[in-house]
Amino acid sequence: KNPASAVVIGGGFIGVEIAENLVHRKIPTALVEATDQVMMPLDPELATLVSKEMRSHGVDLRLGSSVVKISADSVELANGDVLPAEIVILAIGVRPEISLAKAAGLEIGTRNGIKVDDFNRTSNADIYAVGDAAEKTDALDGNATLVPLANLANRHGRVVADHICGLTVRPVKTIGTAIVKVFDLMIATTGWNEKRLTAADIPHQAIHIHPNSHAGYYPDAKQMTLKLIFDPKSGEILGAQGVGIEGVDKR
């Protein structure tokens, strides 16, 4: 039996996908996000397009809101609003599970993940670590980062297998590429966004273009929004984002 109402707490990738699936099951759904936008890897102007899409499909989107109480059939927000909720789903991020690594005496890194080298070896050369609990190296600044994505875990698993077998291995750094579908929109992001670059005081500029998903002379082309962020001196690409009904994932 479907619940009569649902509240999703958290507006990241998992939260927005869960909200979509609840709506598809015809369950009235609210999504509560503490920041002023969904999907923090996006810059605000693209995140706004995602918010508009979600609201157009009936999601009660509560941005800039925090939860103060969860009851048997409701969720209370800090502003006093009470949302009906026969089911509450928490999608507020993940943290590395490092208890086993600590028990084994392995070194923990600056991001509170398992510290590894370029070949995913831990501080014990006989132990490798891959996946969400292992720190990665950011391709842009060379610092440790956490990127809980399946594709990256798969690639690092292959690095480990090759290294164990004595093959020549090229280290795999991360740029945090992710693609997600939310209702009729495809959303893609890679590299750093402007918020992060500004916070790190890294010079950058951005351009926006709105191409069609395919050649205009072929029917049913859909417009998309693409954003490219780059270093104004070197021209190095620092990040990119895209939102659209078709073609974004192929860019």
Where are these regions (language model features)?
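A short, glycine/Asx- and small/polar-enriched loop/turn
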Residues: 70-73, 123-124, 219-224
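Mid-to-C-terminal Rossmann-like scaffold of FAD/NAD(P)H-dependent oxidoreductases
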Residues: 133-248
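Rossmann-like dinucleotide-binding cores of NAD(P)H-dependent redox enzymes
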Residues: 3-8, 13-69, 147-153, 168-195
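Short acidic-glycine loop/turn motifs at beta-strand connectors
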Residues: 71, 79, 231-234
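FAD-site-proximal beta/loop scaffold in flavoenzymes
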Residues: 1-2, 74-76, 81-162
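General small-molecule cofactor/ligand-binding pocket signal
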Residues: 60-62, 128, 205-207
